[in-house]
């Protein structure tokens, strides 16, 4: 049965707007933070938001706070809209790396915060509630043994966090209830924290992506392609964006008939066009051929129009992301794939990328071998058994085939999987990243995510499970994580071709789960419009673009006209240690890598300034030499002695 994709409950109780802070979110903390991964916006904020007002506390906590001055040192820094919901003292965090540490555990409507003053510097654990997958009780009131009674939170970002409570303290029940309430607000008919967060940034990230400007950058519309508003009210396809690019000679009435033959109405529409050959990447869902092998003249004519728009090739390639056996099995459900008999001059290629359930299981296996500890003696065989890198290889290899066919073959391609919102998004966005240097800039990459993932209906709400306690939901899958992993693999092979750094990619993934920003909420453009996210929430790009120096690759050189061909073989791929194993302190660099990036950027700027000064000096000397050469000189007549 099809699961409802509504996200109307995400902001069910919008908070009244608070006076926003205009201070930049800069870190002032020097405490040890073994498990903190938030961007500075999620960890430390301006003094305005670290208010000592009792307004930030539930009434039953005010007495506790006023009676214990030490609590002020143990409380978390609060974001605008954030308030404390519960606090438990004398809780022990069972750290899998450094051992048990005792401190104060605080639950707000945004985060789980643990701080111990027993260590110098203080030990801090800071995790957004959005990252929590499930909360489990450990032991009963009669449990014996040290630290055998408490809570364990299983997280979406690989971690498990375990806290021991004293049975006589009666704090476990209260913390558990508040975690279940605020970590899963959608299940409790409460708003996600993104609807409470009211920070103001210099740039509005919601305005970053303008589809008309992006298509104009690509040279659209032209004589072969037009922009249609047939989906302006999302009536043609409720998971597609309002503006679509389609063949110029196909009228809107025919688009409706094509939509009836494609799964969920997701017709082939243009994602990218080659600036020289006019070869295109179009994306769609599977055709509804069924076991009887149904055909659609309108769909066949439509694909012919796509092929005809490229004068340099008389064929078209259809890349089906699925394994062929899965595509055949989909016929029993009414779906299927394009028959080469029905579609003239079309070649069908299966890319053998597995479905969301296989990927979810692969990530589960990966978590088992990387957290908390790594078994060195069987590391390679254990990693191989997860098949994670094998899946990454197949996705990269598929995108590479698409990019090569467009660039070298000058041939238009059509990409789809079953519904066209998971594997299809991975393939089109990665191929476009290889082909177009614009998408390798920081803002260009943000546009790519907005365009190929958000506007074209990747189901972020269902795949991530924002605020939903149903952790066993079969719709959850690490599809977007795999895409970012593939991007990281490309940055390793082409370290100077990307304007952004690893910290940028990790920040995006952290806020995929955090629910601090509205960027990754809901399942479609239509739903985000209904929820009025641009007005009611802050965009992740607002935060990132306010401090680009943190996310800039110091080695970046402009490769805008270069096509990247990454090597998609197991020998050239590696596990992303900086993301999957970052919680292990033995795997961390002594200094945060983004600090090193800043130093390198400053050094590069200093050297560039010296180069410019030397160039000016050389230019001035050349000018002076030219002036002297052109000025009249005193003539000396040689004296000759004639013998």
From Swiss-Prot:
Phosphorylation at Ser-58 decreases MTMR2 localization to endocytic vesicular structures. GO terms for cellular component: axon; cytosol; early endosome membrane; perinuclear region of cytoplasm. PROSITE patterns: PPASE_MYOTUBULARIN (PS51339), TYR_PHOSPHATASE_1 (PS00383), TYR_PHOSPHATASE_2 (PS50056). One of its GO terms (biological process) is phosphatidylinositol biosynthetic process. A 1,2-diacyl-sn-glycero-3-phospho-(1D-myo-inositol-3,5-bisphosphate) binds at residues 330, 355-356, 418-423, 459, 463. Residues 1-56, 615-643 are annotated as: Disordered. A 1,2-diacyl-sn-glycero-3-phospho-(1D-myo-inositol-3-phosphate) binds at residues 330, 355-356, 418-423, 463. It catalyses: a 1,2-diacyl-sn-glycero-3-phospho-(1D-myo-inositol-3,5-bisphosphate) + H2O = a 1,2-diacyl-sn-glycero-3-phospho-(1D-myo-inositol-5-phosphate) + phosphate; a 1,2-diacyl-sn-glycero-3-phospho-(1D-myo-inositol-3-phosphate) + H2O = a 1,2-diacyl-sn-glycero-3-phospho-(1D-myo-inositol) + phosphate; 1,2-dioctanoyl-sn-glycero-3-phospho-(1-D-myo-inositol-3-phosphate) + H2O = 1,2-dioctanoyl-sn-glycero-3-phospho-(1D-myo-inositol) + phosphate; 1,2-dioctanoyl-sn-glycero-3-phospho-(1D-myo-inositol-3,5-bisphosphate) + H2O = 1,2-dioctanoyl-sn-glycero-3-phospho-(1D-myo-inositol-5-phosphate) + phosphate. The keyword Protein biosynthesis does not apply. Residues 593-627 form a coiled coil. Residues 41-55, 620-631 have a biased composition (Low complexity). Belongs to the protein-tyrosine phosphatase family. Non-receptor class myotubularin subfamily. The coiled-coil domain mediates homodimerization. Also mediates interaction with SBF1/MTMR5. By mediating MTMR2 homodimerization, indirectly involved in SBF2/MTMR13 and MTMR2 heterotetramerization. The GRAM domain mediates binding to phosphatidylinositol 4-phosphate, phosphatidylinositol 5-phosphate, phosphatidylinositol 3,5-bisphosphate and phosphatidylinositol 3,4,5-trisphosphate. This is Phosphatidylinositol-3,5-bisphosphate 3-phosphatase MTMR2. It comes from Pongo abelii (Sumatran orangutan). The lineage of its organism: Eukaryota, Metazoa, Chordata, Craniata, Vertebrata. The gene is MTMR2.
């Amino acid at each position: 049965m099809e699961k409802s994709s509504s996200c109307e409950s995400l902001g069910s109780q919008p908070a009244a707007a608070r006076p926003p802070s205009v201070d930049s979110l800069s870190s002032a903390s020097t405490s040890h933070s073994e498990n903190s991964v938030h961007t500075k916006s999620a960890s430390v904020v301006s003094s305005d938001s670290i208010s000592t007002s009792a307004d930030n506390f539930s009434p039953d906590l005010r007495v506790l706070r006023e009676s214990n001055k030490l609590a002020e040192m143990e409380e978390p820094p609060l974001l605008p809209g954030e308030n404390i919901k519960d606090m438990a003292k004398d809780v022990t965090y069972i750290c899998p790396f450094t051992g048990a540490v005792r401190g104060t555990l605080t639950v707000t409507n945004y985060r789980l915060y643990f701080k111990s003053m027993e260590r110098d510097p203080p030990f801090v654990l800071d995790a957004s509630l959005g990252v929590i997958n499930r909360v489990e009780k450990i032991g009963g009131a009669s449990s014996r043994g040290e630290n055998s009674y408490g809570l364990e939170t299983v997280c979406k970002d690989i971690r498990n966090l375990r806290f021991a409570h004293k049975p006589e303290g009666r704090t476990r029940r209260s913390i558990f209830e508040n975690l279940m309430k605020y970590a899963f607000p959608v299940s409790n008919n409460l708003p996600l924290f993104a609807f409470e967060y009211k920070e103001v940034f210099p740039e509005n990230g919601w305005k970053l992506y303008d589809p008309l400007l992006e298509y104009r950058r690509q040279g659209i519309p032209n004589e072969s392609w037009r922009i249609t508003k047939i989906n302006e009210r999302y009536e043609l396809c409720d998971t597609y964006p309002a503006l679509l690019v389609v063949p110029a000679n196909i009228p809107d009435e025919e688009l409706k008939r094509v939509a009836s033959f494609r799964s969920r109405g997701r017709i082939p529409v243009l994602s990218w066009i080659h600036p020289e050959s006019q070869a295109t990447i179009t994306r769609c869902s599977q055709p509804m051929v069924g076991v009887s092998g149904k055909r659609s003249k309108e769909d066949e004519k439509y694909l012919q129009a796509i092929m005809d728009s490229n004068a340099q090739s008389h064929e078209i390639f259809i890349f089906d992301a699925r394994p062929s056996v899965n595509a055949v099995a989909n016929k029993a459900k009414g779906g299927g794939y394009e028959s080469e008999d029905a579609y003239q001059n079309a070649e069908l290629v299966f890319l053998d990328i597995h479905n969301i359930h296989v990927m979810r299981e692969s990530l589960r296996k990966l978590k088992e071998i990387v957290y908390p500890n790594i078994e060195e003696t069987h590391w390679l065989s254990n990693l191989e058994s997860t098949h994670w890198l094998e899946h990454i290889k197949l996705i990269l290899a598929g995108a590479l085939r698409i990019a090569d066919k467009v660039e070298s073959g000058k041939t238009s391609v059509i990409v789809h999987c079953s519904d066209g919102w998971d594997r299809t998004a991975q393939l089109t966005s990665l191929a476009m990243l290889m082909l177009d240097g614009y998408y390798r800039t920081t803002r260009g990459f943000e546009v790519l995510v907005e365009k190929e993932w958000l506007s074209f209906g990747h189901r972020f709400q269902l795949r991530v499970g924002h605020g939903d306690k149903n952790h066993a939901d079969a719709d959850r899958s690490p599809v977007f994580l795999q895409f970012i992993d593939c991007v990281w693999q490309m940055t390793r092979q082409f370290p100077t071709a990307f304007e952004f750094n690893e910290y940028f990619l990790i920040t995006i993934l952290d806020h995929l789960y955090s629910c601090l920003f509205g960027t990754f909420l809901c399942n479609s453009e239509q739903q985000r419009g209904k929820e009025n996210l641009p007005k009611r929430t802050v965009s992740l790009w607002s935060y990132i673009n306010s401090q680009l120096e943190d996310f800039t690759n110091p080695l970046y050189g402009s490769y805008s006209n270069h096509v990247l061909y990454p090597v998609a073989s197991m020998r050239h791929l590696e596990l992303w240690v900086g993301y999957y194993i970052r919680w292990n302190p033995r795997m961390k660099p002594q200094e945060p890598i983004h600090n090193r990036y800043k130093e390198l950027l400053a050094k590069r700027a200093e050297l560039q300034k010296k180069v410019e000064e030397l160039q000016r000096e050389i230019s001035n000397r050349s000018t002076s030499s030219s002036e002297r050469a052109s000025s009249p000189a005193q003539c000396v007549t040689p004296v000759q002695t004639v013998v």
